[in-house]
């Protein structure tokens, strides 16, 4: 990552090389999704729950490999997949997301 960008990241867990998404970015991201009230949401990379806790629905699930709920083992029906996945495995994340056949994938 460019040092000019890296210093602006407010929260980072260097032990796991995790970057946490700021709440204002999550709110903007979620505001761009056209959803129905009964949609089932999935946050495949829960982290601290910043996406999950701001989903506009109670019909939601999460995955988090650090909590033994690996997204790559997830096979339930879902309408919307939304999160900020690790870029190091982004291609695999997209493949798995498409396999689940949601109506919306938003990363």
Q: What does each of the following model-derived ranges do?
A:
Residues 1-55:
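S-adenosyl-L-methionine
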Residues 29-30, 40-55, 71, 75-99, ...:
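Conserved proline-anchored active-site loop of SAM-dependent methyltransferases
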Residues 43, 62-67:
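Conserved acidic E/D residue at the C-terminus of a beta-strand in Rossmann-like folds
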Residues 56-61:
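Structural alpha-beta junctions
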């Amino acid at each position: 990552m460019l040092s000019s960008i890296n210093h602006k990241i407010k929260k980072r867990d260097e032990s796991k090389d995790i970057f946490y998404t700021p709440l204002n970015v999550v709110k903007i991201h979620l505001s761009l999704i056209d959803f129905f009230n009964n949609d089932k949401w999935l946050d495949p990379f829960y982290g601290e729950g910043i996406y999950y806790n701001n989903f506009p629905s109670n019909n939601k699930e999460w995955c988090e490999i650090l909590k033994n709920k690996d997204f790559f083992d997830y096979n339930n029906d879902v309408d919307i997949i939304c999160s900020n996945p690790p870029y190091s495995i982004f291609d695999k994340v997209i493949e798995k997301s498409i396999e689940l056949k949601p109506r919306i994938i938003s990363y």
